[in-house]
Amino acid sequence: EISLGLVGSEMCIRDSQETMRYFGSLDEEEWNANLAMRWKWNDTSHLKLGFNYKDKNRDYSATRFYYNLNKLNPVITDIYNTDGFLNQQNIADGQIVVQRVMQPKDSYRAGNEIYSAYLLTDFYPTEALLVNLGLRYEMSKQWVRYASDGGDWYSRRRNLDKNDLFPALNLKYAVNPTNSIRFSASRTVTRPSFIEMAPFLYQESYGSAQIRGNEELQNGYNYNFDLRYERFGKDGDMLSVTGYFKYLDSPIERIQDLQGGATLHSFKNADNGMAAGVELEMRKRLVKDLRLGANISYMYTNVKLPQSGAYTNKERSLQGASPILANADLTYSPRFGEDRQLNLALLYNLQGSRIHAVGVSGLGDVTQQTLHTLNFSAGYSLNKHFNLKLQVNDLLNLSLIHISEPTRPRLI
């Protein structure tokens, strides 16, 4: 507290956490290797065998600087003249001390190594039907090293090692030269990111919630089914309708909880969930060099939660999934000679209301409200080697609003 000489009933409260300065150092490297072989047995059919290797490593550490004002106790005659007490002279005299803090729990190291092999083939059993079959094997080794509260640097380690098979099937049936039907089925994986898996406390932006990763996270697996109708017109015009269904095994969700009286965001695997929806997409040439594109989708999601879990709402949609999504773009691309071209684009996006963080232990869900964004981009190609680009994002400049449901009372 700093007393005020003229108005003794008011106080300036020191909040070392809010005035703290935070610096993060991230060192990350990634190595990739690919090898593929292809055999053709006729003009339209082939077999492909491939191998992939990926090794990604991260080293992150944080340093905090705190202002220690314990020795500073001036009488302030002008609250608007902060230079009278927050100045270099008081720092030199030791009245204000800047403390540099590096703690083991503020650092982590993480890595992910993936060995994979795949086999795929394209062939035409009939003239109108294209079949694409694939099978991928992956051996992944993901790990994170960190320190618990009061522990030594990188003293704890969590491993997430998996061996998985990912089959895929894609069918395309050409009804006629302008109409086709596609069907696809696949199994895919959602791995926790390093920041989701590392039990490291951080903030995404000033004033936002504290976030801590969860070292107990497991992979999420997705079973995807899509059916799509496409119609192609002249000048690149296109219309498509897609229906899809996804079964989600152990999806990763962002949650919010109470720890030490403060709200803390983290991540957790739900039991399972599903998503089903329909999407409409079109591209249309309006006049020469002017095109309009748009797509809109509706999606229904549902999550099954553990019976004995601490989730506040037992029935809800999937975290992060918007039921309504829409995009539209208007592009103008005239050419001036062989190399010069102007590209102007106006891009609109609508993202419906969605759960930003799932509430547990009586805390309500945090919902992100519907968001509209409008971006503009311009580019001009002088020749094959030089381009000028301009990008202006968020022309509408609307607020991103999060609303938290009321906390439910708990009986103790």
Predicted features by range, described:
Residues 181-182, 190, 216-268, 274:
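Membrane-embedded beta-barrel scaffold of Gram-negative outer-membrane proteins
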